[in-house]
């Protein structure tokens, strides 16, 4: 057996909340053969399979009576380079931000707004990760996934992935598809997205009138470091709640009641509300209850001050959801996967 395997192993090093639960089995998959071996082992032992990447979009609320498969495959390359259009590929276990920086170092634009997002390449399509006006689907070409039902490989183009807001086919069917590698369509001709106010403002403050993709990446990294705590210092999973969408009627009703409402109009007429603003209106920013709390600089971020359980984090999240529901009539949906 070439598969690296640990029994009754703590998952604290493998989730950014730093929750100390144990896995019945933990396997580290470095290639497709390891993945297939892990699937066979899980079937042999009658264990469910939980696939993780960087553990940055995960809240563990109990011990995991399963085989936890950590995707650790490495590799990134340029597949084709045709003038303006460059196809790049990365293995699922590649850390996301180093992959972004690798592409920028090669003069490739398209991922700069997604800089410093935690996690792995394989997890990016599951969530359709997004930030500062750009989502993964905007540069997505295709991916290779293994069908856990019959062991076959399948290629998915953008349409087949059914991307939505922090959503995809792979999030809807987590027990079927296991992403092995991802291909993105990047460009050497920069088409920068500078709609997000603080990014444009920071560039102007630095006197950068004609920014490059690397300038945008650097500024976004700086903004994220100011707003979001380092999980190595303070356990967290980044933004804990999705920005909720409301229809035009509800949006107008909310604007009447709250003239300072923060929201972003959508092409379909709906309004995407700033979840952080909704939470902050309830006075939650900087709140602390023992080992769990809300970050002082960003109300969207729930934090583990040390020794918190996943159940304590979930209980705090539920209190915030109830407060926002009562105050605004709006439902907040957690962004991390809860186990």
UniProtKB/Swiss-Prot annotation:
List GO terms (cellular component aspect). Answer: cytosol
Give cofactor(s), names only. FAD
The FAD-binding PCMH-type domain sits at 18-189
What pathway, per the record?
Cell wall biogenesis; peptidoglycan biosynthesis
* Active-site residue list: 166, 239, 335
| Family under the similarity heading | Belongs to the MurB family.
Keywords, comma-separated and alphabetical: Cell cycle, Cell division, Cell shape, Cell wall biogenesis/degradation, Cytoplasm, FAD, Flavoprotein, NADP, Oxidoreductase, Peptidoglycan synthesis
Q: What is this protein called?
A: UDP-N-acetylenolpyruvoylglucosamine reductase
Major subcellular location class: cytoplasm
Q: What is its EC number?
A: 1.3.1.98
Role noted for this protein: Cell wall formation.
Q: Which reaction does it catalyse?
A: UDP-N-acetyl-alpha-D-muramate + NADP(+) = UDP-N-acetyl-3-O-(1-carboxyvinyl)-alpha-D-glucosamine + NADPH + H(+)
Query: What does the record give as the organism's lineage?
Result: Bacteria, Pseudomonadati, Pseudomonadota, Gammaproteobacteria, Pseudomonadales
| Name of one Pfam family that matches | MurB_C
Tell me the domain of life.
Bacteria
* An example Gene Ontology biological process: regulation of cell shape
The entry's localization annotation reads: Cytoplasm
Under HAMAP family, the record lists: MurB (MF_00037)
Q: Name one GO molecular function term.
A: flavin adenine dinucleotide binding
Please verify whether the record's keywords include Membrane: no
Q: Where is the signal peptide?
A: none
